[in-house]
Amino acid sequence: MIIGIDNIKHLLQLENIYMAENVYDRIVRDVECCNSDKFHVSLLLDQDSNLISYGHNEYFFGTKYPFTCHSEVNCINSYYSKKIKQYVKDRKKVLIILRLSSKIKKLGQSKPCKKCHNFIENNIDNLNIKKIIYSTPEGFVSVKSNKVSEME
């Protein structure tokens, strides 16, 4: 079964995630501008589905040793680089990780790699993450924060 980009909103609503339209618009716009067939994006939302932080894969080729910053790390680092009010820090959060194809408009496997998994696990308490949702070709997998160690 192929899940299209258009179905993301419906699938996230099944997870009780109701993001603002402009967040969906941003994701679609970024996917369409992407040069790669595989676009990864991560979103950190508060308990009311307000977007707190956003990150996508970034590729750095201008150095002697080219590297990639995965969307999960980019999103979390973006959170730390902002001036976040204490009441927002105290709120429970959801980390959503999506892999989208810009060419065939479908969801893909976005389960965090081992390094990103460790990075997320090391930041769960500080970020107050209650669950992580990641895409698969069939839809979404939702993992509660106390079960993240089993996600590997």
Question: Positions of the model-derived regions?
Answer:
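Zinc-dependent deaminase catalytic domain
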Residues: M1-E152
